[in-house]
Amino acid sequence: IIFSAVKEKRVKIYDERKREINLDTVEKAIIDFEKRFSGKTIGKDSIWDYIRPFIGEFQFEEFVDYTYEDLDLEKKVKAYCPYIVRYREFNGEKDDTVQMPLFWIFPEESKDTNDWFHVPDTIISVHQLRYPNQMPFSTNLFSLVKENKIQVFRPNGEEFNTFKQIEDLFVVKNNYVYYDEETGEETLKESFSDIVPEDIIAIRIGEGWKINRKSLEIKKQIYFFLPLYQYDEERFGQLGLRIYNKKHRNLDKQ
């Protein structure tokens, strides 16, 4: 849908500085990118069909509205940019990729409410929580969950057996080796620390996308989210909770 509109010049395209660019500029950049990183020379007449399978990422300029009282989230997309993603190495531990942003689209809000294409898959993304939204959202999340005022699920969507299982998620257990200088013996011990609202630094979101075939406007509907906490200076962990967005809380879970 997007590529057809771009090829037929039915939509204006821009670079990362929001300067309008022409189709020839994008096509030349794609040809140079493929020749450099895949060693293949592609013709202008086959560019868009050739790169379609390699569109592996989108960058969005979007706004997130938070309703702190009931943890409801809503996204509004202002602009987006598709990326070519080429894997040079993929082994489960290290993903070595090269990426190329193609163009930015700033669609107008669609007046046609019928001509939408619904992406069939649930899209998973990570959204960073930053001040000033982080603290009231995280604080109320802790309050609602710990007081059992909102229904939560395991990350896979299954229900918890007991409320104690939910409470235990807010405590991190670490194993460490204790060395006794007097005896010279090493003992494996456990330490416990509480997860606090300040530790929640991001949420993993499951969402549905739809795109208007005429205006190319993209709308997102958030189905659920999973809080992520700061595990150490370099890593974050999954708290172990799936919280459905307000519109999906009393429906059959997907």
Where are the regions a protein language model picked out?
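A domain-level signal for the mature, folded cores of soluble proteins
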Residues: 1-69, 86-91, 107-214, 232-235, ...
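Extracytoplasmic
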Residues: 53-55, 75-77, 100, 198-200, ...
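Short, solvent-exposed coil/turn segments at beta-strand boundaries
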Residues: 68-79, 213-224
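Extended serine/threonine-enriched, polar tracts that run as long, contiguous segments within proteins
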Residues: 81-83, 226-228
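Conserved beta-strands of PAS-like sensory domains
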Residues: 101-105, 239-246
